[in-house]
Structure formats: C-alpha cells, structure tokens
Amino acid sequence: GILDVSRQQLKGASNGWVVASQRTANGSTILLADPHTELQSGAYYEYRIQAGDLKSAGFSLGPLLWQANNNHLSWAMTTGNPDMWDCYAVEVDPENPTRYRFDDQWQEMVEFEETFGVRGGETVTEVLEYTRHNGVLSPVVARRGNTAYVVSTSQMHDAGLLDNEIWRMNQAKTVFDLRDAMTGLGMFPQNIVAGDSAGNIWYLRAGKTPIRPPGYDWTRTVPGNDSATEWLGYYTMDEMVQMLNPPQDFLQNNNVAPDRMLTDRNIDAAAYASVLFNDTPGRITTRGLRALELLSDADRLTLADAHDIAFDETWITAKYWVAALQYALVQFPGWLEEQSAETV
C-alpha cells in the first residue's frame, strides 16, 4: 500500500550542524535543523510566517517559533542538557500528611485539584501537591511512609520567560544578538547550533542550571527538610558551555557530548562545572561520527552537498562488520554451505 509517512517515527534523536560561509561555494552560511519528528506531529509543525518586522520559517513547538530561520540567522536544537532538576526527601507530619518539616517548622503544602480528560473513558480528578523548595512550586511525585519525594526544577515559573526569549531570538540578526536574547536562560535544556549571514557560528548548551551547595551527592535524592540543601542561585550565560567561531568553520551536535562536536576537542569538560557539561566526556553517536567525517572533508559546500549529507544513509560502523565477515569467510570457507535457515 501507500506509505503513510506521517506515521514514521524516529524517536530520541536529532541532528544539527552548521558550516560557516568561509567553507561554502556561494559564501552563505549553511545550517541543518533536523529534529527527527513526525511530519504531522502533535507538537512540532513546519511553518512560514511574515507579520510586520517578523519574518521566520522553521519548526514550531506549539505556538513557539522553535527552530527558525529569519533571513539573517538560523539555529537548530538537539537534545542535550545541563543538570536542572533535583529530588528531595521530605519528612511529612504523620498526623497531617499535607504538612512537611522545613527548618524545624511545619509548612503547608500547596494543593490544586485538577480534572483530566481521558480519551474513551471518564474524567479523572486528582489533587496535586507541591512544596516550595528553592522558591518554586516543587511537585510531590511519590510517598513512602512519612516521607514525600519532591522534584524541584529551575524551569518552574518560567513559561513567560521562554515565550519572550523565543520572540527575541526570532528578532536577532547575528549570533551575538542571539546570545543576548538568551541571557535570561529561559530556554529548555537543548544543544543550540546557530549561524548568521556574516559567517559567524555559535554553540550553546542551554538550560537554567542551579548552583548547589557542596557536600551532597546531587546525583541522588538529597535531604529536603532544611535550607542547607537550598540552591545558591543560578549559573550565568558566561559560565555556560559554548563555542564561537571554531577554526574548523563548522559545528555539529548530533546528540553528542560537547567535546565531540569537532574532530579536535576544542571544548574541555574540566573547564566547566560538571552540572553544566553533564555528559560523559568523549561520548559520541554514530550520527555524530558520520557528520564529523563528512563535514571535515567538505570544502566549497553547496546546497546539493548539504542535501546529500542530510540524507546520507551510510552506517559508519558497517565497514568493521564487513571486514570481520570477510575474515570469517577466509577462516571458515565451508561455513556458508553448511548453514540453513534453521541453523543460522
């Protein structure tokens, strides 16, 4: 039958790369934004808009002009993030489980009653409980005995900040404008790869990241009954993992660690707070390896070349399998003749 391309899903992966104008045939910066989403997604939509000073085209996330080109500047996003969330274990009052202890006082949880529609079923009403850890509403996600487990995220209360930031990003004309637009750190955790018409390219590992007090293992649940584990503030834009105009004149982040965006490791993980780098140094995907191979060899890149790179189907590790199988055929020359569908 006819292939329903709207139902083809590629989950958990995105590609983003940019080649500066110095390495392209026509002197234009070329950027790929490939979010690996469905053509008819419930969240992402391809769009083109012109309204007054706003001229933008790309992929929207709901109403937000998410991955965009505005004739002066383009950017792509791929999954990758600083550490922006923490889990707290909080003692609750056994006589009143909606109260929790904080700095030797009982505090009342904030409660909201919400009703959720269920497709094909009856609505469900739940009471949602929150504490006020780190100055933000922090949801109770589990209970065990007299302990409530609470998740605190720096993104809570920042929805309006994100809207304003996306608007300013779409108004930017250079990567320097883009950086200024993002200094409020309202962006969701993402790898941002950007390029402008002047040939500048830039990478940012975006995400509003808390500064934690020392002395705790923040990779696990921490005590949440006093202010000793309250966040001390947030890292600034200047402290975030980023790179501007590398000498290779290209950048790629196909879901790789920040130090594997180039063949030479221009980013040193040790130079950043671990919660900002927040990845295994040297980790790379097969998509990242292939992008490095193709982009490193690209010179006087054309749009046709970029198209070929975007749709390249080479599986970069296949050559090792071919070599191993060729070796096996030499070592065991009669093996194939002895096999059947039942024995392979």
Q: Where do the protein language model's features map onto the residues?
A:
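Mature extracellular/secreted ectodomains of secretory-pathway proteins
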Residues: 343-344
